[in-house]
């Protein structure tokens, strides 16, 4: 069962977006960042330095 969330780039209608959903689009040499499915925050991609 999903935990509710109020706001954030990985929330939609008070639920977490699915894991793997892009939450921050790549810029320059950086890669996209993806939702984890467990948080409303958009975690930083570890490959982005």
UniProtKB/Swiss-Prot annotation:
Changing residue 4 to A: Only inhibition of platelet aggregation. Keywords: Cell adhesion impairing toxin, Disulfide bond, Hemostasis impairing toxin, Platelet aggregation inhibiting toxin, Secreted, Toxin. Changing residue 33 to A: No change in inhibition of wound closure and platelet aggregation. One of its GO terms (cellular component) is extracellular region. Gene3D superfamilies: Disintegrin domain. GO terms for molecular function: toxin activity. Expressed by the venom gland. The keyword Ribosomal protein does not apply. InterPro entries: Disintegrin_CS (IPR018358), Disintegrin_dom (IPR001762), Disintegrin_dom_sf (IPR036436). Changing residue 39 to A: Loss of inhibition of wound closure, and of platelet aggregation. Belongs to the venom metalloproteinase (M12B) family. P-II subfamily. P-IIa sub-subfamily. This is Disintegrin eristostatin. It comes from Eristicophis macmahoni.
């Amino acid at each position: 069962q999903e935990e509710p969330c109020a706001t954030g780039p990985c929330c939609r209608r008070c639920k977490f977006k699915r894991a793997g959903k892009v939450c921050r689009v790549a810029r320059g040499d950086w890669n996209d960042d993806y939702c984890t499915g467990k948080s409303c925050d958009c975690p930083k991609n570890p490959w982005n330095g």
